[in-house]
Amino acid sequence: MGTSEEELKHIVIDLGCGPFFLGINDKHFPGFLNKQSNACAIVNTASRETGGVHWIAMGWHPPSNFYLFDPFGFSDKKLLQIYQFEYNALLKRSAITSSPDRCVQLFQNNESVQSPHSAACGLYCCMFLHAFANWPAHPFDNPTMDQLVGVPNNMLEAPRAQSIFKQNQETLYSFLHYNSSFFRRYENKLRKQTDP
C-alpha cells in the first residue's frame, strides 16, 4: 500500500525540510528551477492519476549539484525499464534553468536499502530529505544516511540481503519515531502500510 502524499508531507515538515521542500510530485515534476537556493522534492515514478508506483527523492545544491535518491538504487535505465520513468529530462531542465554553465553534476546512490517486498520507499525518501536539509553538500554521507546499509542491486532478492533490509526498515522506523511527531501519532498505521 505505501504512504500517501499527505502523510509524506507531514513527515517531511516534522523533519525540518520545510524551507527547502518543493512538495510531493508525480513523474511530471519540472525539475529545479531556482538556481540560487537549496531545494528538494519527493517524486513518484508514475503519474498522479494512477495512484503512484514508487517514490524517489531529489535535491538541488547550488551551483550545480543534483542529488537523486532511490531506495532501490536503480539507474536511469533500470527505472525506465521497470517504471517507465526517466530522470534525464529532469536533469536537462534543471541544467538549462538553474546552472550557470548549463551543466549539472549528478550524484546518486547505486545500492538498495529497501526490500523489494517493502512499501516504505516514501519513508526512506523522507529520511534522505532530512539528510539533504542538514548536509546539502553530502546528503549520502552523514549521520542520518550512515545508519542504513546498502546492498548491491543484483542482490535485491538474495536471501542473505533480506535481514539487512529488515534491519534497515527498523532503523528507518526508529529514526522517524524519534524525529517526527506525525509518525509517532500514526506509527501503527504507517508500519502496516509499509511493512514487507
From Swiss-Prot:
Record site feature (Cleavage), residues: G51, G52
Enzyme Commission code(s) on record: 3.4.22.39
Catalytic activity: Cleaves proteins of the adenovirus and its host cell at two consensus sites: -Yaa-Xaa-Gly-Gly-|-Xaa- and -Yaa-Xaa-Gly-Xaa-|-Gly- (in which Yaa is Met, Ile or Leu, and Xaa is any amino acid)
Root EC class: hydrolase
Induction comment: Expressed in the late phase of the viral replicative cycle.
GO biological process: proteolysis
Active site, renumbered: H54, D70, C121
Regulation: Requires DNA and protease cofactor for maximal activation. Inside nascent virions, becomes partially activated by binding to the viral DNA, allowing it to cleave the cofactor that binds to the protease and fully activates it. Actin, like the viral protease cofactor, seems to act as a cofactor in the cleavage of cytokeratin 18 and of actin itself.
Keywords: Autocatalytic cleavage, Disulfide bond, DNA-binding, Host nucleus, Hydrolase, Late protein, Protease, Thiol protease, Virion
Gene3D superfamilies attached to this UniProt entry: Adenoviral Proteinase, Chain A
Localization terms from the record: Virion; Host nucleus
GO cellular component labels: host cell nucleus; virion component
Subunit (UniProt): Interacts with protease cofactor pVI-C; this interaction is necessary for protease activation.
Function: Cleaves viral precursor proteins (pTP, pIIIa, pVI, pVII, pVIII, and pX) inside newly assembled particles giving rise to mature virions. Protease complexed to its cofactor slides along the viral DNA to specifically locate and cleave the viral precursors. Mature virions have a weakened organization compared to the unmature virions, thereby facilitating subsequent uncoating. Without maturation, the particle lacks infectivity and is unable to uncoat. Late in adenovirus infection, in the cytoplasm, may participate in the cytoskeleton destruction. Cleaves host cell cytoskeletal keratins K7 and K18.
Family: Belongs to the peptidase C5 family.
Other notes: All late proteins expressed from the major late promoter are produced by alternative splicing and alternative polyadenylation of the same gene giving rise to non-overlapping ORFs. A leader sequence is present in the N-terminus of all these mRNAs and is recognized by the viral shutoff protein to provide expression although conventional translation via ribosome scanning from the cap has been shut off in the host cell.
Protein name per Swiss-Prot or TrEMBL: Protease
Native source species: Bovine adenovirus C serotype 10 (BAdV-10)
